[in-house]
Amino acid sequence: MIQMQTNLDVADNSGARRVMCIKVLGGSKRKYASIGDVIVVSIKEAIPRGRVKKGDVMKAVVVRTAKDIRRADGSVIRFDTNAAVLIDNKKEPIGTRIFGPVPRELRAKNHMKIISLAPEVL
C-alpha cells in the first residue's frame, strides 16, 4: 500500500536508488497504490552517470510492497521492502535489468516487459 510521501527502493539499473511517491495515478481522489499500479515519483537518490538524476520526476510501477497481497486461492504474499521500476510514457522500463523477485500480479496489469526481465516471478 503506497501513498504520497512513501519512499521506495528502485528495482532496476536506471541509476536511481531511492524514489518518493508524489502522486498515485488512476482516479481523481485515489489514495493508495498496490502492486502493478503506476505512480509518479521524484528521484531522491541516484548514482553518478546513471540514466536519471536526483530531482527528476518520472513514472514508476510498484513491483513489491510490504503490505501483504491476497491471491484468489487464499494465499498471501508480502515482501520486506517497497520497490518500484521506473518507466517511460509508453510504459516501457527505463532500465535494462530488474533486481529481485516480482509477483505474477504484474502479468494481469499488462507489465509483460518487467516480467520478462525479472530473475524470478513469484
UniProtKB/Swiss-Prot annotation:
GO biological process: translation
Family named by the database record: Belongs to the universal ribosomal protein uL14 family.
PANTHER family: 50S/60S RIBOSOMAL PROTEIN L14/L23, LARGE RIBOSOMAL SUBUNIT PROTEIN UL14M
GO cellular component, one term: cytosolic large ribosomal subunit
Keyword vocabulary terms for this entry: Ribonucleoprotein, Ribosomal protein, RNA-binding, rRNA-binding
GO molecular function terms listed in the Swiss-Prot or TrEMBL record: large ribosomal subunit rRNA binding; structural constituent of ribosome
Gene symbol of the encoding locus: rplN
Protein's recorded name: Large ribosomal subunit protein uL14
Function: Binds to 23S rRNA. Forms part of two intersubunit bridges in the 70S ribosome.
Gene3D superfamilies with a match to the protein in the record: Ribosomal protein L14
Known partners and oligomeric status: Part of the 50S ribosomal subunit. Forms a cluster with proteins L3 and L19. In the 70S ribosome, L14 and L19 interact and together make contacts with the 16S rRNA in bridges B5 and B8.
Classification via Pfam families: Ribosomal_L14
SMART domains named in the record: Ribosomal_L14 (SM01374)
